[in-house]
């Protein structure tokens, strides 16, 4: 159903790490991606019933983490510290072999 809307995007922030990632048009952010430091993050969506105030969606937090984090530990800390809208299961891996599964 969403396959026609998947787009591969190359990100080249001025002050950050380059990344390749999939996005679902027209949603902002990254669903799955890997940056130049070999940090990889993938999202499995989850149904959420929370009624929270509008915040950045999870995919925006993933894109931001890929641009600014080199390790799983950095990415988990950054993503968990920020308010967000939505839920999901994140899988993260980095060049050192560190792995994490995070439920949002």
What are these regions (language model features)?
Residues 1-104:
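N-terminal nucleophile
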């Amino acid at each position: 159903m969403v396959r026609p809307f998947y787009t591969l995007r190359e990100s080249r922030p001025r002050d950050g790490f380059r990344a390749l990632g999939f996005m679902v048009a027209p949603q902002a952010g990254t669903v799955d991606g890997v940056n130049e430091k070999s940090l990889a993050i993938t999202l499995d969506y989850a149904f959420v019933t929370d009624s929270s105030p509008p915040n950045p969606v999870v995919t925006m937090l993933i894109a931001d983490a890929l641009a600014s984090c080199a390790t799983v530990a950095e990415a988990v800390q950054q993503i968990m510290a920020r308010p967000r809208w939505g839920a999901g299961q994140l899988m993260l891996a980095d060049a050192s072999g560190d792995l994490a599964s995070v439920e949002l």
